[in-house]
Structures are given as structure tokens and as C-alpha cells.
């Protein structure tokens, strides 16, 4: 008989809809594991799946700012969202029937719910931390502004961070096992809970595989959110394109940068591009559905990953899913600027592409693959040991940890 897993996670919001959980549930051995997923419902997002039972709890009833602020404060002070989720779970399923509880989050919610259910029903608890507050170092990283005054915002956010870290650690300490997504995260969290395991983000090998698709233009492609241009910094690429254009080595009818970013930072990025006077090389698009991403990446000549150098002030251990999807299709990866840390190391070890530190490197990289595209109509790189990053392999690692905890 299959063992039942009660999975708690943060909301399924676009454009990715928590791919780590989706892929885990899809790739678990159905004869051994039966996942049931509980999360928060996102307003105006009608996400559902037939892969596993999915229960979504409405918490925010509308996008009204007053309503949102009230519910946010209520949750900050009393963790009301976790309280409501526990009631929602107990009203929709029998927790006694599950063999273990698994909670995956990028922040705090729903860790407290997971801990309380684990304690109440005496169930083993495994925590998957996809992001942690400390990875941002001294940077402030919140998506909502409470005040129009920056210093007041920063003060409030720092107090919230301290409270959230305290609440998070209360659960981490009690967990039977922890999983996380980068060597930096592993080393940091292991100091709190020694039974911590590294499981990178990855790619679905069933849909992200190489195809030799010829294209009429040499496309440098970026997909996903672009929240902060200081954190995800494209300057090395823009300067390289500017110089190559001035040197008459590329033209906008042959080379394009395609930004699939929706409206996130579109205006700010457009203004930055204008400073380099290379508007004709750039095209903007809305987010694309997940099922179209593999084909898009395969059509690309270079897949772009934006980050910045890791300093003693952060950020640390940022390993975007987009990188792993790019190596799945075996297209050249251009990472600008190199983090000179975890991501750069994996790029080097896998021969996936370039983690750039200067403009000349970027120019040389673009020209090399541009020449390959001119010869063949497509580009390709031989990625080393990419199978270790497949979602299928990750599911096997998760299953091993589940079994160890249940022994």
C-alpha cells in the first residue's frame, strides 16, 4: 500500500506555480507514495491539476488594499494564515491517515501549520526550504511597501525579518529532516538542524531535452520575473551588444534579445537599454505558459540568466530554476553577471556556458555561438552530468529521505 504524504506549500502563483512541488508529486513512485497538497488560493488565479489532490484555501478575499493590509497585519501578529490553514486541512482530510508531513516554502508560511500538525498527530516532519531570509544579506527584499518612506520601510521589514526567522527556526529545529537548494543554504541551515540535505532545483527530463531546431535569428532569451535590476543585472550583456554593434560584428536583423518578463521592470529595463542605444536589438513579450517554455528554450541560441556578484553582504546561494531548464535543453547559458559562487561553480562543472565577469568575455562568448549558429542554424553545448539535476533524480533523493525518516 502506498504511503500517504500530507504536503503543505506556499501559493501556486504564476508564472511557475511552484515547480519543485509539481515535479516532486509527478515523479514520486505512485506505487509507494500518495501525495495530497494543501496551500493558499491566489486571487484571480484558477490553477488546478489532475496529477494529485490539490486543496487551496482562500485567505485574501480581494485585492483591496485596506483588506490586504488588515489580513497581512493579522497574520504578522498572530500567524492567522497558519491558523486558518490548519482548520482548513482538518476540515478537508483526516490527518491521522498520513504517514508523514512534508512542507515546502520560500519564506515562512506554512511552516507553523506543519509543525503544529506534526506535534498534534505525532507525524514525522520534513521541511524543504527553497529560500531563506538570510540569503539576501543586508539587502531588503520585500514585494510590498508599507510606507512611502524608505527608511521606515526598511526598519519595519528588518523587524519582520527577525520575527519570521525566530518563527521559522522554531520549526526547523523540530523537523526530522531538512532539504534545501544550494551548497550555501545547506551549510547555513545545517548549523540549525544537522540532518539537512542538498537537493538542487532542476529540470523535467521528459520535457526539457535537446532538439536541433533551426532559427532565422540568433536569439538571446530571458524568461521569468525581473524584479530588481540591481540583483539581476544585465549591464554586461547590454554593453557587449553595444560594442559588437559598433564593431559591425552583429546587426539587429540577425541578433535579438527576447525578454519574456510581462510588465515586471519593463519600463526600467527599457530605459536602461536606451542608455546603450541598442533598442533595435530588444523585444519584449508577456510571460508564456509553462508548456511552451521547453520549445522556446530549444529555439533560443543563448539562454540568459541574470544575477550579480555575491559579496559579504549578499545575496547568497541563488540557484534559479531557469538555469537548470536551460541545461536540460543543452543550449549555451550566459550568466551575467557571475555570482562567483554556487551558480558559477555549477556552470563550470557542467560545461553549461559562461558565468561572465567582464564585457570581453561576453563578447567572445556571443561571437563564438553566433558563428556556430551561422554554420548550423542552431547552437548546442555538451552538458556534463546533467542527469543529476533532473526532477526524476530529485524525486528518488526525496524518496530516500522519506524512507529514512519513516524507518
Where are the language model's segments positioned?
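Acidic anion/phosphate-binding donor-loop and adjacent secondary structure
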Residues: 203-217
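Acidic donor-binding loop of glycosyltransferase active sites
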Residues: 176, 297-316
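Short N-terminal targeting/anchoring amphipathic segment
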Residues: 89-110, 123-130
